[in-house]
């Protein structure tokens, strides 16, 4: 699963997701992409599940790029713990995804295979997504 090798601070504030993605909104590496339509925290487990769903369907053909990285730690307190006594320990990592962000890209497969692979990947994610094609793609 994806996570940073080391971080400057173990715990971060939650923050809020305002507006649309400013960068990473167009297909850069492959010919096809999966774009987020809603804001969300995507966990490293969800990213990995989507990646596996795509690569299994594509059967080792083509290449997949993951354009998001989970660099935000999410803390949790143990169950049945009273309030107070500090912030919980980091439990998992999330990528902050805003609307318009391209999360996955693929190349080296036909448009039909890519469409189905991204549909399977989208089922593993907690947000609405959209299949996009590079403007200069000629299939």
From Swiss-Prot:
Q: What exactly does this protein do?
A: Binds 23S rRNA and is also seen to make contacts with the A and possibly P site tRNAs.
InterPro entries membership: Ribosomal_uL16, Ribosomal_uL16_bact-type, Ribosomal_uL16_CS, Ribosomal_uL16_dom, Ribosomal_uL16_sf
State the name under which the record lists this protein. Answer: Large ribosomal subunit protein uL16
GO cellular component term of the entry, any: cytosolic large ribosomal subunit
Going by the UniProt record, its keywords in alphabetical order are: Ribonucleoprotein, Ribosomal protein, RNA-binding, rRNA-binding, tRNA-binding
Which CDD domains would you find in this protein's record? Ribosomal_L16_L10e (cd01433)
Source organism of the structure:
Chlorobium chlorochromatii (strain CaD3)
Q: Name one GO molecular function term.
A: structural constituent of ribosome
Q: Which superkingdom?
A: Bacteria
Q: Does the keyword Ribonucleoprotein apply?
A: yes
Q: Name one Pfam family in it.
A: Ribosomal_L16
Q: Which PROSITE patterns does the entry link to?
A: RIBOSOMAL_L16_1, RIBOSOMAL_L16_2
Its subunit composition reads: Part of the 50S ribosomal subunit.
Instruction: Mention one GO biological process in which this protein takes part, according to its record.
Output: translation
Q: Which family does it belong to?
A: Belongs to the universal ribosomal protein uL16 family.
The record's NCBIfam families line, in alphabetical order, gives:
rplP_bact
Record-annotated disulphide pairs: none
